[in-house]
């Protein structure tokens, strides 16, 4: 049987890293847009400007929600490959060799950290939306 654990790990990790970075950006951007809206309302700015800012907040929140959904979708394959790498169910020499090599990679440790961080985000979002 042919395995390519390293390639699988790097592909899944790359998708999660990009999406997690984007999600964090949208969290920050949403906070900034809301603060800007609040300031505009407090300063009693023109109603059309406030309306445009509300639209901007909605757009940013929509992008954040979509990115969150993508993150949830991408974390599953990363979890699967990490579980496969950590499993001790195989007697296949090729698999065991690759497994040992991948476990020593910094990307494997990074993958586990991103899984933990994403699980925390999912937990927080679940609590927020409950």
Where on the chain are the PLM-derived regions?
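Short, charge-rich amphipathic alpha-helices with coiled-coil/heptad character
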Residues: 1-15
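Non-transmembrane amphipathic alpha-helical segments
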Residues: 12, 16-19, 23-40, 60, ...
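A structural signal for well-ordered alpha-helices, especially hydrophobic packing surfaces
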Residues: 20-23, 61-64, 68, 82, ...
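Short E/K-rich amphipathic alpha-helical oligomerization segments
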Residues: 31-54, 76-86
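Short, charged, amphipathic alpha-helical segments
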Residues: 49-58, 96-99
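Amphipathic alpha-helical coiled-coil segments
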Residues: 56-78
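Coiled-coil termination/hinge junctions
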Residues: 72-98
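Long C-terminal interaction segments enriched in charged/acidic composition
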Residues: 91-130
């Amino acid at each position: 049987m042919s395995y390519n654990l390293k390639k699988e790990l790097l592909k899944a990790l790359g998708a999660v890293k990009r999406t997690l970075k984007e999600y964090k950006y949208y969290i920050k951007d949403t906070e900034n847009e809301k603060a800007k809206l609040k300031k505009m309302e407090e300063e009693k700015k023109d109603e059309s400007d406030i309306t445009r800012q509300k639209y901007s907040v909605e757009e940013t929140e929509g992008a954040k929600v979509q990115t969150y959904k993508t993150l949830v979708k991408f974390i599953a394959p990363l979890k699967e490959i990490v579980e496969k790498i950590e499993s001790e169910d195989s007697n296949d020499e090729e698999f065991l060799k690759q497994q040992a090599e991948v476990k020593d990679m910094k990307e494997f440790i990074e993958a586990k950290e991103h899984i933990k961080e994403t699980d925390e985000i999912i937990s927080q979002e679940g609590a927020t939306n409950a």
